[in-house]
Amino acid sequence: MNQPNRGQILQTVFSHFFPVASPDSELVPSSLHEDITPILRVAKDVEDTNPRSLFLQDLDIKSVDDSINILSGHSHALDKANELDPTSSGRDVRQFKNTILQWLEKNNESTLKARQKSSDAHEMQSFYQQYGDEGINDLLNAGAGSSSSQRTKIYQTAVVLYDVLDAVHRKANIKVAAKILESHAEVEAKNKIYVPYNILPLDPDSKNHAMMRDPKIVAVLKAIRYTSDLTWQIGHKINDDEDVLDWLKTMFRFQKDNVSNQREHLILLLANVQMRQTQRQPNLLDDRALDTVMEKLLGNYNKWCNHVGLESSLRFPKDKQQKVVQQRKLLYTGLYLLIWGEAANLRFMPECLCYIYHHMAFELFEMLESKGSKKKYKPKNPTYSGKDEDFLTKVVTPVYKTIAEEAKKSGEGKHSEWRNYDDLNEYFWSKQYLDKLGWPMKANADFFCKTSQQLGLNKSEKKPDLGDGCVGKVNFVEIRTFWHLFRSFDRMWSFYILSLQAMIIIAWNETSESGGAVFHKVLSVFITAAKLNLFQAFLDIALSWKARHSMSTHVRQRYIFKAVAAAVWVLLMPLTYAYSHTSIFIVAILIYLSPNMLPEMLLLIPSIRRTLEKSDFRPVKLIMWWSQPELYIGRGMHESAWSIYKYMMFWIVLLTSKLAFSYYVEQIKPLMGPTKEIMSVPMPGYWLPEFFPHVKNNRGVVITLWSPVILVYFMDTQIWYAIVSTLVGGLYGAFRHIGEIQTLGMLRSRFQSLPGAFNACLIPNENTKEKGIKLAFSRKCHKIPNTNGKEAKQFSQMWNTIINSFREEDLISNRELELLLMSCWAYPDLDFIRWPIFLLASKIPIAVDIAKKRNGKHRELKNILAEDNCMSCAVRECYASIKKLLNTLVTGNSDLMLITTVFTIIDTHIEKDTLLTELNLSVLPDLHGHFVKLTEYVLQNKDKDKIQIVNVLLKILEMVTKDILKEEIKRLHLLLTVKESAMDVPSNLEARRRLTFFSNSLFMEMPGAPKIQNMLSFSALTPYYSEDVLFSTFDLEKENDGVSILFYLQKIFPDEWKNFLERVKCGTEEELDAIDYLKEEIRLWASYRGQTLTKTVRGMMYYQKALELQAFFDLANERELMKGYKSAEASSSGSSLWAECQALADIKFTYVVACQQYSIHKRSGDQRAKDILTLMTTYPSLRVAYIDEVEQTHIYSKGTSENFYYSALVKAAPQTYSTDSSDSGHMLDQVIYQIKLPGPPIIGEGKPENQNNAIIFTRGEALQTIDMNQDYYIEEAFKMRNLLQEFLEKNGGVRYPTILGLREHIFTRSVSCLAWFMSNQEHSFVTIGQRVLANPLKVRFHYGHPDVFDRVFHLTRGGVSKASKVINLSEDIFAGFNSTLREGTVSHHEYIQVGKGRDVGLNQISMFEAKIANGSGEQTLSRDLYRLGHQFDFFRMLSCYFTTVGFYFCSMLTVLTVYVFLYGRLYLVLSGVEKELGNKPMMMEIILASQSFVQIVFLMAMPMIMEIGLERGFYDALFDFVLMQLQLASVFFTFQLGTKFHYYCKTLLHGGAEYRGTGRGFVVFHAKFAENYRFYSRSHFVKATELGILLLVYHIFGPTYIGLFTISIWFMVGTWLFAPFLFNPSGFEWHEIVEDWADWKKWIEYDNGGIGVPPEKSWESWWEKDIEHLQHSGKWGIVVEIFFALRFFIFQYGLVYQLSAFKNKYSSLWVFGASWLLILILLLTVTVLDYARRRLGTEFQLLFRIIKVSLFLAFMAIFITLMTCRLILPQDVFLCMLALIPTGWGLLLIAQSCKPLIQQPGIWSWVMTLAWVYDLVMGSLLFIPIAFMAWFPFISEFQTRMLFNQAFSRGLHISRILSGQRKHRSSKNKD
């Protein structure tokens, strides 16, 4: 047997890892990937050319161990293997090698037979020479004719081939030919030059590339390559193309790929800025452009230097040439970009980067100055400049490790016990700490402090002295408590409390006191204010206590001084009030208020206040010391005076309305009379024991009655906010022309104005568009001359691009496409715009009919044509088309002369305006009919019709096959035949919506469009983890209850499915299934209707298409424009106009998808990686960034390895051989950049970390963040350059916007009724809600995608999101917080929209709501919200509160009001007080009832009704609202109220916030009962059960009157119990119920848990996980949990005395004690049974049964005895159950909270048993009514029609009938 060769390794690897015929080069272990993958890729390319060469290339795998060495007999293979992984210790390496060995043994013989030469060496040499002759030489000869990507690929291939050739020759002891060595040397040199590039090909041969010919690019390149004044390190070989960034690399030891990445970044940034500058010297870099970039990049650094008191390191030489100064600026700018590009996780700490940059820039300055110094000394080297990658290892890595170590504590620790990104960053806000850290950074500095555990010390060992100690939390501590709400918004709470006190005083004394006396009493509110101020000062100290050592001295002094001052005023105020005159007390008040007067007065002069706040001048800081903490951020945030006036008036109106309503109508004044009466009633006799026997009045009763009213008082501002914001938002939207074009009829009526509006908005021109109030009241439509000129051509091409996009998306049919397209062919005879056929529909038939009926009445005909411009255009175009058609078809001289004569006569009459009077128009109908037939015959072109055409036309019949003439004949035929049916084109609702919105937006206010060269450049970034890229065929056809996703989509998108079949030319689904290659089209069609990455990428790549078309409009001359962009695109070449358009688009736009796990998916053969690669191949401009984890084995340390992490960017690799494009195996990616990281980058929240990893690969001045569940539209992409201009306009503000908010359209509304509810709710928020937030309130933040960021501003200030674990769970909104705190501003724009998907199933929606509620809970604890609450003025602070955490806190108060009301009423009922007082407490319920229903109606429905009314009409809005109620929207929203309440409270008390992936899929499957129980048990079922028991007891002992508020609570109870099953697909199908019961019994089975058992499989595992958050809760959280659990014992206390044996007889406390004795007996019984079951249940089964029977008989005997003796009655048994059930639950809650104290095996097992019994009983009781309703088929029918639209409901029933046939067909397809 011949010895195996290394070439066989290739096939072996992939036959094992990916079983296909040809090997996959991507499935290589990460430790071998870098060396082996290039060889395998080359082998794939040459596989078909030379099989033996393929075999031999596989030889050079280099990683074969001793077993392969025995076979090969050559030491070289072993040496190479030992060099890489001698012990096969890397992950999957041994498996990789064994598979190779098996393939070697199997395929050696066959490859030897295929060998053409005598030996492997000669075979390889022959192939290499052939490749050189045919590949490399042709490439060299082609020169600039080949692309840079092709050259790069060919040279890389040649290098790999030579490596294989050299290895084979050395094995055979043959020298490589000199000619080959010479060729290889040239190739090797070229290979170093031609590296993969991202956007700019910077190799020497790409000078003629369209981008590289741009003068701005050339100018920037020339500037950065000026290095003649720089001194390189000794030994460095200088190349001609090296630049200042290369010099920085050699001096500071940055990574090569980081330099390459930032080089392109800097070039594009400077070039794009220079494009907007007025050209001075076109071939030189303009200093203005460089200064602009430098100012934006280094603005934060300069501000930081001023704050910490450091002199800036940006120092420039004096009296130097401009080139030298410019070079210095480029060096400073490039240095910052290189630091930022390699900083990894440090990018979240902008001031840390400022610190690093400050010292490195100073070292740069010293190096440059030492070169120019006259003194002779050695130039100074940087501190960290020894080895390669020193910057990473010595600067970035130490800081990163500190971050990583702190992040590890976040898993189980509290926020206060670890430092997050903000804490570590704020360390660099103090010069004191900077001096301690020093430069070079001291390893023993307090910043790097380590715990004993990190140092590896035992508890007994003493920690060594590491310096100044550990710096913990800095400036702020996130303590988990509700008091953060008061601390952050203390001014608001003080205002409410003082207002309430004042109103109560006035109402109480309104009739009994004089005005002066009442005024004096009202002044007592300032005593309360002083107490509240003291409480606030106490909270500041208490909640910041853990940061006392790390906060600066002036902050500590400020806290102490404020506390002392507040304490003094608490003493002085009561004394002054009690012992002095009112006037003296007023003076004291003025003195008390004086420290806060200056900031409030300066509110009216915001420019002065901004200046004072931003100043770092010491005297100014002293003046502002009291009102503003000395922090780096949160200063100068005040808006303009006009903006302040607007939101001030908003809140004055709102608060006035709220307080007046509360006082006069609802809460204060109406309740004073009943309250006085209650207070005057003598103390009633209590049925319960009196704990306070000496109380002489009814204050306790008043507190009980007023408590829910007070809660409503604090909560109802949210309702008033909903009312006022709806009115303001609706008014604002109306003034902005929103919804002016609502229907197709409105679109047709204004369509002729569209070209003018398009020209004014989307075409660069000098005319300024009306803005502001002028535009709001303007009804003038933009019009252009009705000529077929340049403007019309531009509009028609843009319009046709949109319509063609609709057809590609299957929104319209082929016929609708023809009716909607505008004709782009120029007619010399036509001087007007040729409108789309749908606009001219039925105009010709109507005109013919009118002409026939009114023959001779030429004046009427002229008036009709004059009034109807569309009819006039249709008639003129029809005449011109017929004239051209006949002149084209007729060639005979006599016939042509006759036709010419006829048309000449007609033209003469037209010129003289005598056509209608001289010609007989009655024959027009006959002529019309003949022309219709003629066009039909010509279009069909059938032989049998030729006899119907005159002989003269037969001769030239073949001419109709020409495209232009054919299109014109089609148009003429449509003009002649189309009737009224075209008026409803397009019929698809989505197409209608998009067309009407786009048309409407052209009449809205937007900035003028700049030319493409002058627009801001931008990038789009999409974070992706592991969601669906493209639906697989299996996923689409997989059925659940007879319903597949594909079937589901066909039913809810029937018209789009029909259009799809028409597009792929299939009449039926069966024809479609028969064609294999159309399966990919089906996958795409379905994926475009889901929430997939493919849909998002397609939408975002419309930017590329739109920019190319707009660039064509800018660059094309008149002749090229008339030909159209498609003509330019078809003739594209390296020097063509279209190449320039593409180059401009590439310069202006970049799209990066951050596929975090792309490398993992690729190496595991995951289909998602292949689908992503397909996307890159389909869209060559798409880039994918990912985190590459590479395993590296240690050569000298056996069995050990280390993982290294890289930020990588890839694109689709070019193809050098023509292969079948459908073969996915030939699609490869190409690594562009690979930047090493200091460690695993995902140490915080995953999504922001993923964004941070990819942001370094984005380009431009703006960055749009797009989630992977979003979509975009071609028509909206045309408006992007207008939107970007918003960054250059202040729009009445004082600063340029830093975030542009966009409107969103929820495209999942048609999926189900739940999706519709969520769509309407979300739609109102992203439109009218954010409209008001941005203007007038000025508190719009970042609520997720698709906002556009000022990229340069944010990359220097922490990025586009925050990533600290847990606290930044809602990472998006923190970007808005951060931007606002750093003097940015956020605007909102509604003339552009982006599609967005939402969750469509109840469980998905609930998980999303839970995540948002968790995030809001964490926001409540955050420093960002605290600083906004304190640094905003009072009115803006109110806006911030009620639009962020206030909404969730008010939702919590809504539910708490129910609890307080019920427990209070229960107290009144059970104690007998209510009976004594009569009906006086009823007033409280009436008030609460009105409040409850006002909340439901206004809070939920009013914004939705207003926005739908604006956009579609108020009739549709009202209809939608009624329909939503019929589909149980109130049930849905009430249920979600419980979700918000539970998770917000849980987060604030105990934590447990986490990201919850919802899947974003279609929910057509049934959720199991056990799954619903797990998810909703604690959040809804338990609370609903408690409320139900309270209501039941209240109705038993209370009055017969049932109020509206009580009814609403019953509604809430029913909703919380049964909504999950009501909205569960097939929730009432009997067969599903049976399966659910079996699954429930299996899950609830006791003792089926344990370590490693998931919660989905075991009740025990689920229960342990459910209470896990209590183990990490703080002490106060546990105390609060126990305190609230005591309410169940109070409930028991009340019910015990209602037993017939004790009622009205015994009121002693021993009765209550006896009830506890009974509880203990029951618990002991349960414990005995549990113990017996565990001990005796297996081996002593009989004894266990005897014990159970004995206990049962004993209890029955006791029960019968008590009943016989009349000691208890039957109703007493029921009351005992009602009392004991809550008591047991309360004991269980307390036990769970105290788990660490009682976690002894015996005790804890009792607790677990009790919990299991409760879940078993509660779940079983829930299941009974569901099973009962499943008996009735009509309930299931109703549910299906309610959940899904009618078309799907009908299809669902049909599918069940035909399910057997479809399954049979599916199985046949698989076969």
Swiss-Prot record:
Q: Which residues lie on this side of the membrane: Cytoplasmic?
A: 1-491, 543-558, 605-640, 725-1441, 1507-1516, 1697-1708, 1763-1772, 1837-1871
Task: Kindly indicate where the leader peptide sits in this chain.
Answer: none
Membrane-related topology note: Multi-pass membrane protein
Compartments, as annotated in UniProt: Cell membrane
Topological domain spans for side Extracellular: 513-521, 580-583, 662-701, 1463-1485, 1538-1580, 1623-1675, 1730-1741, 1794-1815
Q: Which domain of life is it from?
A: Eukaryota
InterPro entries attached to this UniProt entry: FKS1-like_dom1, Glyco_trans_48_dom, Vta1/CALS_N_sf
Known EC number(s)?
Answer: 2.4.1.34
Pfam families listed in its UniProt record:
FKS1_dom1, Glucan_synthase
Q: Does the keyword tRNA-binding apply?
A: no
Single GO term (MF): 1,3-beta-D-glucan synthase activity
* Broad class of enzyme this protein falls into: transferase
Alphabetical list of SMART domains matching this protein: FKS1_dom1
Q: Coiled-coil region(s) at which residues?
A: none
Residues crossing the lipid bilayer are 492-512, 522-542, 559-579, 584-604, 641-661, 702-724, 1442-1462, 1486-1506, 1517-1537, 1581-1601, 1602-1622, 1676-1696, 1709-1729, 1742-1762, 1773-1793, 1816-1836
Where is this chain primarily localised?
Answer: membrane
Known role: Involved in callose synthesis at the forming cell plate during cytokinesis. During plant growth and development, callose is found as a transitory component of the cell plate in dividing cells, is a major component of pollen mother cell walls and pollen tubes, and is found as a structural component of plasmodesmatal canals.
Its name, as the record gives it, is Callose synthase 4
Q: Which organism is it from?
A: Arabidopsis thaliana
Q: Provide the gene name from the record.
A: CALS4
